[in-house]
Regions:
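Gly/Thr-rich phosphate-binding beta-strand-loop-beta motif of the actin/hexokinase/Hsp70
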Residues: 2-33, 170-206
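A short acidic (Asp/Glu
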Residues: 22-23, 137-143, 167-171, 191-196, ...
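Conserved phosphate-binding loops in N-terminal lobes of ATP-dependent enzymes
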Residues: 37-130, 212-226, 231, 238
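Glycine-rich phosphate-binding loops at beta-strand->alpha-helix junctions
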Residues: 127-139, 230-257
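ATP/nucleotide-binding catalytic cores
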Residues: 142-150, 167, 173, 179-183, ...
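Conserved phosphate-binding/catalytic loops in two-lobed NTP-binding clefts
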Residues: 150-164, 255-276
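Short, flexible helix-coil linker/hinge segments at the edges of structured domains or between repeats
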Residues: 151-170, 175-176, 190-223
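Conserved small/polar residues in nucleotide/adenosyl-binding loops
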Residues: 287-289
Length: 289
């Protein structure tokens, strides 16, 4: 649905190490937060964090199109954009040294073009970018990258995945976070977990968060996943479990999934962090929602 020109959009942008995701809320619409598909007419929410350049020509592609073009047309593929920007070393592409932060800005700009599904980037009223860790160097990189977007708003903020998980939880029905809430994120060689528990007897409610990382050397190991699940949920009340990452699957999670589903609500998806960033920005922004 196209929007009347006066309405602003609040954007939650999850900037991961390999993928990005974008969720948005149309201020004043009363609609739910929407996660943008990277492929028209589909439910593909993950955007590969990659660019590719056509050799000899200043023509760039991003996301899955960048990967495809590099494979089929011998384009120059540039991945790990966030790491490259953080490291700060010039990137040699097609005989030219390029600023890695400028490459990240290009990716952000192109991917925000997905807002054309509901509006356009000029209607961004507030932007929250969330990433795994947020130290001083990452803040410096994100500030520089977003400055290059020249958005018509000063409401640009950054937060960690932990904070996005917190805000996502607060906007869910209370029965899902009445007791402990567990998030498991499938990383490359590990399972990263966040456990949140709220003390509802305080005003305001105080949330306790614990981060852990479990080695996961053998991909799709049901036995190892069951061991992790038992460590996280054993001998305590857990209201809900979120499995983040496309690698989680019922095909290999037999006993571990059966254990997790026993007396708990279990959800699988990929857009929790971008939605949490959007919920957070809805609270922080000066836009009437």
């Amino acid at each position: 649905m196209r929007l009347p020109g006066s309405e602003k959009v609040i954007v939650g942008y999850d900037l991961g190490s390999r993928y990005a995701q974008i969720s948005c809320y149309v201020a004043g619409s009363g609609e739910e937060i929407r996660t943008l598909s990277s492929v028209a007419g589909s439910q593909v929410f993950t955007i590969p964090l990659a660019l590719s350049k056509r050799q000899g020509v200043n023509q760039w592609f991003y996301g899955s199109e960048a990967v495809r073009y590099a494979q089929e047309e011998e384009g120059i593929l540039v991945e790990n954009l966030l790491k490259l920007a953080r490291d700060g070393e010039p990137v040699q592409i097609d005989g030219t040294a390029l600023d890695p932060v400028a490459l990240l800005t290009l990716f952000l700009k192109r991917s925000l073009g997905l807002l054309s599904q509901v509006t356009n980037a000029e209607k961004i009223g507030a932007l929250m970018i969330t990433c795994e860790e947020l130290d001083s160097r990452m803040l410096e990189v994100l500030a520089a990258a977003t400055a290059g977007l020249h958005l018509k708003t000063e409401q640009i903020c950054f937060q960690s995945h932990v904070e996005s998980f917190y805000y996502y939880n607060l906007y869910q029905p209370e029965e899902l976070w009445r007791h402990k809430t567990v998030l498991c994120e499938y990383a490359e060689h590990s399972i990263r977990t966040y456990c949140m528990e709220c003390n509802r007897h305080t005003t305001p409610v105080v949330a306790y968060m614990e981060e852990r990382e479990f080695p996961f050397p053998v991909p799709e190991s049901d036995e190892k996943m069951l061991e992790i699940a038992t460590s996280l949920c054993g001998n305590q009340i857990v209201s809900s479990v979120y499995l983040i990452g496309e690698a989680f699957s019922q095909e290999w999670m037999k006993e571990s999934l059966r254990y997790l589903c026993h007396g708990r609500r279990v959800f699988q998806g990929n857009n929790l962090f971008s939605k949490g960033a959007c919920y957070s920005m809805m609270e922080l922004s000066l836009i009437h929602i």
